[in-house]
């Protein structure tokens, strides 16, 4: 859900918001400054893309977050807002998949590569680029149907391995994959589980991910625009068939990509609130 906080005259405001594991909360704040603090994250408030007098903060809720209440505090010079965050669980589905056994129980010679790739990805996602490259709404990288939703618990060859950290989009034959928005290509290489992989840094803690690609149309360091063709879809890595896996990382936390871009895109819809309020959309 998107929480819009309009603040005037008061120096403190208390409200509540409900969030869900694996989803993000988008906060629109009364000033483009300050810090949003949770029990495990300190998030810089960012400039609103269409209103210079407001700020935004994107709070990802970890897939494995526990249910219950926690406090979020926004602090800026002379102002503060306390938000009671109520975390609820999403009932994600279970998927049973059959894949190459080597992608479930990797051979010993692959383990070093897998660990190296995980460490590299962690370092990428935890890096905060203090620049925003995008100034418009985000788009899906393919105009096709979803074949596997975000968050499903996945059993590979009878063994529960993980949850699905993105969405799968239908791509029966190699077709062009488009950048969801502007940014810098940070990674473009083959990886053990995700196959042909591209990661784009959109700035300010946002990274989009594209997996199982068959061909790259960009290289590391390239600046891409929304809609640019960055690759062709494929069937590389741990897959059951050809498709595109699309994911998003926010401040180092994996989040539902379509939920995230839907919420960010509301920032480009004019708002007309002109009173002191806390409104939940």
Where are these regions (language model features)?
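Zn2+-dependent peptidoglycan hydrolase active-site motif and core
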Residues: 180-217, 242-244
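Short, charged beta-turn/beta-strand-edge "cap" motif at the junction between a beta-strand
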Residues: 191, 230-238
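Surface-exposed, glycine-biased beta-strand/turn segments
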Residues: 84-194
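Acidic, glycine-rich catalytic/binding loops that coordinate metals and/or anionic ligands
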Residues: 92-120, 134, 219-226, 247-281
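Short, well-structured beta-strand-loop connectors
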Residues: 176-186, 218-233
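N-terminal signal peptide c-region/cleavage motif recognized by signal peptidases
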Residues: 11-13
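Sec-dependent signal peptide recognition
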Residues: 1-7
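Cationic-aromatic interfacial patches
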Residues: 15-93
């Amino acid at each position: 859900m998107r929480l819009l906080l309009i603040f005037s005259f008061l120096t403190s405001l208390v409200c509540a918001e409900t969030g869900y594991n694996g989803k993000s909360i988008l906060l629109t704040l009364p000033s483009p400054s300050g810090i949003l603090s949770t029990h495990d994250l300190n998030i810089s408030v960012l400039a609103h893309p269409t209103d210079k007098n407001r700020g935004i903060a994107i709070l990802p809720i970890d897939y494995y977050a526990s249910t219950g209440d926690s406090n979020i505090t926004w602090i800026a010079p002379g102002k503060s807002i306390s938000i009671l965050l109520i975390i609820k669980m999403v009932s994600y589905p279970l998927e049973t998949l059959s894949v190459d056994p080597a992608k479930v129980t990797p051979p010993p010679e692959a383990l070093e590569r897998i660990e190296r790739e995980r460490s590299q990805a962690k370092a990428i996602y935890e890096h905060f680029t203090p620049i925003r490259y995008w100034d418009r709404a985000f788009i899906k990288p393919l105009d096709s149907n979803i074949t596997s939703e975000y968050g499903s618990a996945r059993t590979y060859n009878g063994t529960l391995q993980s949850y699905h950290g993105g969405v799968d989009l239908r791509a029966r034959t190699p077709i062009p994959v488009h950048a969801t928005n502007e940014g810098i290509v940070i990674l473009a290489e083959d990886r053990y589980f995700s196959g042909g992989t591209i990661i784009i840094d959109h700035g300010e803690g946002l990274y989009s991910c594209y997996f199982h690609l068959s061909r790259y149309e960009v290289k590391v360091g390239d600046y891409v625009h929304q809609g640019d063709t960055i690759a062709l879809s494929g069937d590389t890595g741990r897959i059951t068939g050809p498709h595109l896996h699309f994911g998003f990382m926010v401040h180092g936390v994996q989040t539902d990509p379509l939920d995230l871009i839907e919420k960010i895109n509301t920032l480009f819809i004019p708002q007309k609130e002109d009173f002191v309020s806390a409104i939940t959309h």
